[in-house]
C-alpha cells in the first residue's frame, strides 16, 4: 500500500510527524516551559485508484521523565515475568509428579493417624478399642479392594478348577448341604427348647407357616427358584445367630446401638437453641422430629463422601453372591438398610425402565420391609431398644429378597449386568457444606409428612373408636374399638411369631396400627408399654393388661420395623412412577403384592428373632409361690424372687383390706412375697391376715 502525506497547517503543539525520523521525535517544538510536549499524528487520508481502505497512524513523543517511567515499568514487568516463570515451573512439576506427591501426602497423613491410634492403645487399650477395631476394619477393606482390583482375574483362574468340580457334582451335593443344615437347626432347636422353653418352637412353626402361605399365593408357584429364598432365610438366621446369640456379636451391636443413641443426642443442642430450654415439653415436635433433620444431614454428607455407596456395594455384592439375585435387586435391598423406600431406587434409576417385573416387585418389597436411617433415630428416641432396631434393619434386607422371589418368581432374563448395576451416581453437591445444607433442606418434606400424618391418623383413630363405640353401644357392647378389631384379626399372626398368648392380642393391635396407619403410631404405643414396664407399674389394672413381656417387646420391635402400610403404598407408586414413567402400569399392578410381601418379610424377621431370643420364658409362678413358703421348701431363690416381683407389680390395691393379687395368685402367696422382699413401693399392711 502506498501512503501520501498531505500538508496541514502548523499549530502550537501540533505537527505532522507520521513519517519523520526518530531524531525529530526529540525535537522540542513548544518553548513555553512545559516539562513534556506530546506530538500527535495527523490523520493522512488518501483515496487511491485501487480503492484501498483508510489508514490512521498515531505517534506519541516521550520526554526524559516519561522514559524513566517506562524503564521502571520494564523492570516491574521483568520481575513479574520471573515470578510467573517460577510459578509455572512449580505447577508443571506438580502436574508431572502428581501421583507421587499424592502418595507422599497420604502416606504422611496415614502415618500420623497410625501413630495416634498406637498412642491411644498404649495409654488405655480398653478405651481405644473401638478406634482400634474401626482402623483394622478400614485397613482390611482397603487392602481387599486393592487386591481384588489388581488380582481378580488371577484369583478367578485359580478357583476355576474347584468351581468346575463343584458344578459337576452340585445336583446331589446341594441336597446333602441343605439337609445337613436343616437337621442341624432341628437338633439345635430341640436342645435350645429344653433349656429355654417351648416358645421357640412356636416361632419356628410361624416361619414355616409364612413360607407356605407365600408359596400358595405366589404369582407363579411352579416357577419358584429356591436359591434366593433359602439363602435369604439362611442369611437372616446367620445374622440373628451372630448378633443375638454370640457374646461378641451382641456386645458389638449393643455398643453400636448405644453409640448411635449418644450421637443422636447431639440434636438437643440445636433443638434447645431454636425452641428454648423447655423444648422437651413438646416431646415429639421438638425432640423427635429434629432428630430426623440431623440424621438426614449426616446421611447426605456420607453420601457426598462416597462412604454410603461403598457400603451399599459391599453388602449388595454379598447378597448377590449368596442369594443369586440380580444385581439391581441386591443393590436396592442393601441400600434400603440405610436409606428410605423412595431414595434407594435412585441408586439404580437409569436402569428402572429395563428391569423385569419380578425385579420391580423385589425393589418395592425391599422398600416396604425396611426403614430409613433417618426415622431409625426417631424410633430410638421413643425408647425402643436401639440394638434390636439396628439388627432388624440388617436382617430385613435378605428377608425382603426371600419373600419377593417366593411371592413373584423371576420368569424373564434380567438385562442389567453386575458391572452396570454397581455403578452408582454420587451426590450432586459441590462440596461437603453444600451436601449438609441439601440434606437438612431435603428433610423438611419428610418432617412435615411425619407430623401431618400423625395428626391426621391419630385424629382419625379417635373418631373411628368413637364411632365404633357408638355402634357397639346399640348392642350393649360399648368397648368395641379399632384396636379390639385388629387384636382379633392379627392375633394369629402375632402368636405364630412366638409372642406369648396373653400378649398376642396387644401385639396384634400394634400390627393393626402399623398396617392401616404407620409404624410411628405403633412404636409410640409400644414405647408407652416399655416405659410402664421399666417403671414397675402394675401389669393389670381392673383386669386390663397394661404392658407386655420383654420377649414380646423384642418380637414386636422386629415385626413393626418396616414401611409396609397403606400410606406408603401411594408414596412408592408415585416415587417410582416419576423415575420410570414407562413402567407406570407394572408399578401399579405389583404394588399391592409388594406390600403383602413386605409385611410377611417383617413377620419372618420377627420369627427368626423369636427363635433366637434368649429371654427366658415365664416361670410357672403359681406352683413356685404356693410351695415356696412351706417349711419344706426354701424361700429365697432366684425363681421365687422373680415371681414375687412380678406378683407385686401386677397387684391392685383399692384400699385398706381390699387388695387384688395379680395373675390370679392367692393372698397367701402375696403375703409371703411381702415378708420375703419387704417392698418399699407397695404397702403390705393392707393385706388381710385372714385367707
Swiss-Prot record:
Residues 124-128, 195-197, 248-284, 385-386, 470-507, 528-566, 614-691 are extracellular. Keywords: Cell membrane, Endoplasmic reticulum, Membrane, Symport, Transmembrane, Transmembrane helix, Transport. Residues 1-78 are annotated as: Disordered. Residues 43-54 have a biased composition (Basic and acidic residues). InterPro entries: C_nuclsd_transpt, C_nuclsd_transpt_met_bac, CNT_C_dom, CNT_N_dom, Gate_dom. Changing residue 367 to R: Reduced transport of inosine and thymidine. GO terms for molecular function: nucleoside:sodium symporter activity; purine nucleobase transmembrane transporter activity; purine-specific nucleoside:sodium symporter activity; pyrimidine- and adenosine-specific:sodium symporter activity; uridine transmembrane transporter activity. Residues 31-42 have a biased composition (Polar residues). It catalyses: thymidine(out) + 2 Na(+)(out) = thymidine(in) + 2 Na(+)(in); cytidine(out) + 2 Na(+)(out) = cytidine(in) + 2 Na(+)(in); uridine(out) + 2 Na(+)(out) = uridine(in) + 2 Na(+)(in); adenosine(out) + 2 Na(+)(out) = adenosine(in) + 2 Na(+)(in). Homotrimer. Belongs to the concentrative nucleoside transporter (CNT) (TC 2.A.41) family. Sodium-dependent, pyrimidine- and purine-selective. Involved in the homeostasis of endogenous nucleosides. Exhibits the transport characteristics of the nucleoside transport system cib or N3 subtype (N3/cib) (with marked transport of both thymidine and inosine). Employs a 2:1 sodium/nucleoside ratio. Transports uridine. Also able to transport gemcitabine, 3'-azido-3'-deoxythymidine (AZT), ribavirin and 3-deazauridine. This is Solute carrier family 28 member 3. It comes from Homo sapiens (Human). The lineage of its organism: Eukaryota, Metazoa, Chordata, Craniata, Vertebrata.
Amino acid at each position: 500500500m502506498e501512503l501520501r502525506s498531505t500538508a496541514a497547517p502548523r499549530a502550537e503543539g501540533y505537527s505532522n510527524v507520521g513519517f519523520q525520523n526518530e531524531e525529530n521525535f526529540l525535537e522540542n517544538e513548544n518553548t513555553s516551559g512545559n516539562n513534556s510536549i506530546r506530538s500527535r499524528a495527523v490523520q493522512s487520508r488518501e483515496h487511491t485508484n485501487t480503492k484501498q481502505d483508510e489508514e490512521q497512524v498515531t505517534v506519541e513523543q516521550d520526554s526524559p521523565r516519561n522514559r524513566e517511567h517506562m524503564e521502571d515499568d520494564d523492570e516491574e514487568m521483568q520481575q513479574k515475568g520471573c515470578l510467573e516463570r517460577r510459578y509455572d515451573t512449580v505447577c508443571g512439576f506438580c502436574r508431572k509428579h502428581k501421583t507421587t506427591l499424592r502418595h507422599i501426602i497420604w502416606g504422611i497423613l496415614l502415618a500420623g493417624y497410625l501413630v495416634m491410634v498406637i498412642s491411644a492403645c498404649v495409654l488405655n487399650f480398653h478405651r481405644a478399642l473401638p478406634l482400634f477395631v474401626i482402623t483394622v476394619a478400614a485397613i482390611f477393606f482397603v487392602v481387599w479392594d486393592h487386591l481384588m482390583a489388581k488380582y481378580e482375574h488371577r484369583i478367578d483362574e485359580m478357583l476355576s478348577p474347584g468351581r468346575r468340580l463343584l458344578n459337576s457334582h452340585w445336583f446331589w451335593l446341594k441336597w446333602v448341604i441343605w439337609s445337613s443344615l436343616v437337621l442341624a437347626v432341628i437338633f439345635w432347636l430341640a436342645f435350645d427348647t429344653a433349656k429355654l422353653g417351648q416358645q421357640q418352637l412356636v416361632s419356628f412353626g410361624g416361619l414355616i407357616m409364612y413360607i407356605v402361605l407365600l408359596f400358595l399365593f405366589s404369582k407363579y408357584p411352579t416357577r419358584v427358584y429356591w436359591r434366593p429364598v433359602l439363602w435369604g432365610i439362611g442369611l437372616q438366621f446367620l445374622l440373628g445367630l451372630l448378633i443375638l446369640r454370640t457374646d461378641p456379636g451382641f456386645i458389638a451391636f449393643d455398643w453400636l446401638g448405644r453409640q448411635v443413641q449418644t450421637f443422636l443426642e447431639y440434636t438437643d443442642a440445636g433443638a434447645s437453641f431454636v425452641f428454648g430450654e423447655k423444648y422437651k415439653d413438646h416431646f415429639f415436635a421438638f425432640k423427635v422430629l429434629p432428630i430426623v433433620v440431623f440424621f438426614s444431614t449426616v446421611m447426605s454428607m456420607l453420601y457426598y463422601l462416597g462412604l454410603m455407596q461403598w457400603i451399599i456395594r459391599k453388602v449388595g455384592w454379598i447378597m448377590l453372591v449368596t442369594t443369586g439375585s440380580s444385581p439391581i435387586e441386591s443393590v436396592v435391598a442393601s441400600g434400603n438398610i440405610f436409606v428410605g423406600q423412595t431414595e434407594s431406587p435412585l441408586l439404580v434409576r437409569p436402569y428402572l425402565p429395563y428391569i423385569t417385573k419380578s425385579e420391580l416387585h423385589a425393589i418395592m418389597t425391599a422398600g416396604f420391609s425396611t426403614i430409613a436411617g433417618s426415622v431409625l433415630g426417631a424410633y430410638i428416641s421413643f425408647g425402643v431398644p436401639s440394638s434390636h432396631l439396628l439388627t432388624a434393619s440388617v436382617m430385613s434386607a435378605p428377608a425382603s429378597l426371600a419373600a419377593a422371589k417366593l411371592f413373584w418368581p423371576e420368569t424373564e432374563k434380567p438385562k442389567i449386568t453386575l458391572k452396570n448395576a454397581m455403578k452408582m451416581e454420587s451426590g450432586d453437591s459441590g462440596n461437603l457444606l453444600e451436601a449438609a445444607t441439601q440434606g437438612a433442606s431435603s428433610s423438611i418434606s419428610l418432617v412435615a409428612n411425619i407430623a401431618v400424618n400423625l395428626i391426621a391418623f391419630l385424629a382419625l383413630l379417635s373418631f373411628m373408636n368413637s364411632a365404633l363405640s357408638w355402634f357397639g353401644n346399640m348392642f350393649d357392647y360399648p368397648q368395641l374399638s379399632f384396636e379390639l378389631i385388629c387384636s382379633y384379626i392379627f392375633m394369629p399372626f402375632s402368636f405364630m411369631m412366638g409372642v406369648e398368648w396373653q400378649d398376642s392380642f396387644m401385639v396384634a393391635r400394634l400390627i393393626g396400627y402399623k398396617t392401616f396407619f404407620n409404624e410411628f403410631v405403633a412404636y409410640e404405643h409400644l414405647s408407652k408399654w416399655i416405659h410402664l414396664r421399666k417403671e414397675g407399674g402394675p401389669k393389670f389394672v381392673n383386669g386390663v393388661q397394661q404392658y407386655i413381656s420383654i420377649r414380646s417387646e423384642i418380637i414386636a420391635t422386629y415385626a413393626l420395623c418396616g414401611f409396609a402400610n397403606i400410606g406408603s403404598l401411594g408414596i412408592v407408586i408415585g416415587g417410582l412412577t416419576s423415575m420410570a414413567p414407562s413402567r407406570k402400569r407394572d408399578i401399579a399392578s405389583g404394588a399391592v403384592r409388594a406390600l403383602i410381601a413386605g409385611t410377611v418379610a417383617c413377620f419372618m424377621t420377627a420369627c427368626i428373632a423369636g427363635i433366637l431370643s434368649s429371654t427366658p420364658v415365664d416361670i410357672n409362678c403359681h406352683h413356685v409361690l404356693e410351695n415356696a413358703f412351706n417349711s419344706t421348701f426354701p424361700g429365697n431363690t432366684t425363681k421365687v424372687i422373680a415371681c414375687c416381683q412380678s406378683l407385686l407389680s401386677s397387684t391392685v390395691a383399692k384400699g385398706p383390706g381390699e387388695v387384688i393379687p395379680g395373675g390370679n395368685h392367692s393372698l397367701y402367696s402375696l403375703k409371703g412375697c411381702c415378708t420375703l422382699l419387704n417392698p418399699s413401693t407397695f404397702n403390705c399392711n393392707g393385706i388381710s391376715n385372714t385367707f
